[in-house]
Amino acid sequence: MLLLNYTQNFQLITFLLFPFINTFDYNCLKPTTTTTTSPTSSKLGFLNRSKSNSNININELKNKFLEQQQEGSISNIAGVATTQQNPSIVINSSSSSSSSSSHHPHHQKTPSNSSSNFNLIKASFNQIGVAFNNNISPRSNRKEKEKDKDKDHQDNSNINNINNINNNINNNINNNNNNNNNNNNNNNMHNPTSSSPSINNNLKGKNVASIIAANGANLNNSLSNLHQHVNNNSNNNLTNSFNSVSHNNISISSGGSALSYNYTQQLNQNGGSNNGSTSNSTSNSANNSLLSLASSINGNIGSDENGSNVMYGGDIASSYHSMSIDPLKSSTNTETIEIMVVGDELSNKARFISSFLNNGIGEDPTLEISTKKSIAIQSGAYNVNINTTVGQEEFWGINDVYYRSSQGFIFVYNVNSRESFLSFLKFRDKIIHEKGTENILMAMVGLTSPLINQESGEESCIREVTQQEAKRMADLYSCSFVELNSFGLDCEHQIQSIVTDLLGRITSGLSSTNNNNSGNNSNNNNGNSNGNSSNNNSNNNSTNNLNNSAILNESIAQSIEVLMLGDIFVGKTQIIQRLLGNPFQNAYKETTEWNRNVYQMTVNDVRYLLKIVDTCGLDIEETLNRERLVSTQGFIFVYSIASRESFLMIEQLRKKLSSIKSETKIPSVLIANKGDSLIRQVTFDEGSKMAQHLGSHYFEVSSMFSDDESIGRPFEQLLIDIQKSGNASGFEPSEIKKKGYLFKEGKKLKSMSKYFFKASRGNLSYCKNESNKSKVKSIQLSEQIQLAIPHNVHEKKDVWPFSIILDPVSKHSINLIASTEEERNAWIKAIKFNCFLEDITSNIIDDVVKSMVSEIASGVAGSGSNNGNNNGHLKRSDTTQQLNNSGSFINGINANKPVPNFSNLSISGGGSSNNSNNSTPMSSPYGSSNNFSSHLSQSTSSMSMSPQQQLQSVLLSSSNLSSSMNSSFSYSSSISSSYTDSMSGSPPDSNGQVFPQSPQLKKTLFQRTTSFSKGSKLK
């Protein structure tokens, strides 16, 4: 086997057949050639071989050769072919064991007077030692022989890849020849192509280093011919600069990556300005061929016991154009992508990274790992830098740096540990917090290998996370998902695919962003040259962007966070697991910390991502604080029908929530669990009354026997309640005005009296009886007034107190009590609205008056363009738009509620003009159109008028103003007919003017606008 494995060249065979011969005549090694001069016979001397050195003494062989060259006689060495065009080495792999010279290939006879050929042969000697070292390295270890069998299949694929690269380069040259012939019919050019011989399959069993050394000449030939072809045709078709692959380098190291096929691109400035696409396509094809070679060779050199790539025999570097490059250095155009692997201590993150990098980290990982590996994908070659912090999960300052700098994340967990799986949301929240965005690219990897108990050493194969649950979690957060049996070398290909897929998602996002930016820049450039056409394109692009964003918003689900509250042992976790589709677990496992679970649900054609927070029942009241509940939108109270203590704890939890949450109405449901229990301590009626007291819906289920529909019904009802509370966008007319009976606390403590209250028009009035309003007391509501719910008062049955704080400094307040919680919420909502009603009305009036002035200004422009036309019409679209935009002040009340729609307002009015020059009735909403147009035309034509005269050109009818104010409050007039009575005009005075009756309104109007008496005439 040793002889069969090392039959690379004849010199090696003779060396093995005669190991004890001290002298050897090398005349038989001279090739048979036909020359004019007779060949000179010479001896190269002795070949020394010691036990400590199994390689041929190349230095001694080289010295013999140099001595003969000085004498004028040169002999070629068997197994080495040198040509003038390509001085690379071709190792003859087809040598037989026979000593006959006819079995050897013929070599070129080099003249003794050729110094250039001598330099070529001398340069070839520098590579003989490396080539022989790889060919005759002894493999005495049986394990290495077994590994050689496994490498046969990989070496065959590498041989085919190298052949394909040569064929691709030759095809690219032929394509260029065809293009040149089509463009230059009169010029028949001879395009040099490389006839790359096929690689001998007898190299099977050798490492990739020997394959590259044996076939490097073919690749160099192809690349040099391609370079020469580009230079010859630079003046015809190849106009742009050609990225020639003139320095292709092959280097092997035993450290990080196994084999890096690095090449540097040189820009050759070529003339011409015709067709440059051919040059670019040829260069890209050559680059892609080299990238495919790098990806095919990478990782197939060999590996030691730890999985790291090693060399057999030494390093190889091709000497073409004095090539040498550091394998750790990459091209300047290669981009680095940061990827971080996250997970808890049970996920075996270090082994995952070790299998991907194949660098021998193994079972002894460092505390901080930062390793790069080059990956070639369709979009190009990238340096993937994988980071993780094994053992530093508690040091958030270190992890934050990795979170912010990483572009993609890989979450690994163990399927036999639910705690390991639930840490996904914890890590994702931290990443979102650090990066400031929810647009995160992640991959989820599940490890199915058994857990090993560190104390007992026993393996645990009890699966706690189903594949369906993990797949659902991955789909909700747009993560790729895969499960692996192990993170060893047997799954290296799958791990490589996971990282490659994530890299493709990252680079596609970056390329789409760059394409959008370049597209916008190109549209702008085209706009400068093409004019209107570019504007149309930009409008179309903006329309498409709006449509895409609308589709994206529709596809994005709303996120709702729900909190499960209840005593210990009531079954909160089992209800969540049944909702997620997992079976009931008989074994009890206490929940020691708050865990998040995500469930997707569609209610009323709206898709929700329900984030269900499972709380620990032990000391739940102490763990509830404002920071934990700030993002919670709904609550689920759970108690056990077999435990009255858990039932009584619901009231304590409700009071705790009421003291923390500022909302008066908190969406919640009440679930009575363990309905299958024979020991019942809480009846169904008691649970129903508790739910009525909470203002919630009541459900009684069994986490063991209830079906999936019964388990999911409480969550669906909670989402409906959240929808209702969220859809209360803006105050309805029935909520603005509120009247009814409330109990008011008297001067004496605990002295409650029943009064009739009415909240409307920014006032809160109350009296003893609704029919007798002789003694009515009123409170002016303003934004300084606050409302609060006293939580320190012991609430009795049908008692729902709340306080109106009139003076926060002196703490003067009025304590009121409603009969039901819904009644109390309605009163609080109505009082809040009326507290801000004064600001609302002033802002409405401000916007209405500004809109009227803008309409007058538009009428000025219209009358000026009509040259005195008396039939000018005023635009109302601007008024409607501004009124729709007005009311943003309501956001101060509730930022989540949209403003009322005033699009149905109609500002109109009538009146007569007292001008003696024109007694025609007014057809314009703001006065006589004839007189109005004439004054406006004069104001636009005469620019020498004083500012006072220019202001007097605006004739604002107070009667029309009052009527427009009445119409602007049509939204409020639907509440009560008396609401707009105060806004109606008083009887006209001697001048026929009508002013609003409200002093505050009149003051606001005259502060913000300038109105003058009608009939004034410009001089």
Swiss-Prot record:
Bias type Basic and acidic residues, positions: 141-155
Q: What happens when the gene is disrupted?
A: Display directionality defects during chemotaxis and increased motility.
InterPro entries, sorted: P-loop_NTPase, PH-like_dom_sf, PH_domain, Small_GTP-bd, Small_GTPase, Small_GTPase_Ras-type
Q: What GO CC annotations are associated with the protein?
A: plasma membrane; Ras guanyl-nucleotide exchange factor complex
Annotated segments matching region Disordered:
89-118, 131-202, 265-287, 512-546, 860-890, 904-951, 977-1019
Sorted keywords for this record are: Cell membrane, Coiled coil, GTP-binding, Membrane, Nucleotide-binding
What sequence ranges are listed for the domain PH?
735-836
| Chief localisation class | membrane
Report the Pfam families cross-referenced here: PH, Ras
Any one GO MF annotation of this record: GTPase activity
Instruction: State where composition is biased (Polar residues).
Output: 879-890, 987-1019
What interactions and quaternary structure are annotated?
Answer: Component of the Sca1 complex composed of at least gefA, gefH, scaA, phr, and the protein phosphatase 2A subunits pppA and pho2B. Interacts directly with gefH.
Supply the NCBIfam families for this chain.
Answer: small_GTP
- What is the protein name given in its UniProt record? Sca1 complex protein phr
- Organism lineage: Eukaryota, Amoebozoa, Evosea, Eumycetozoa, Dictyostelia
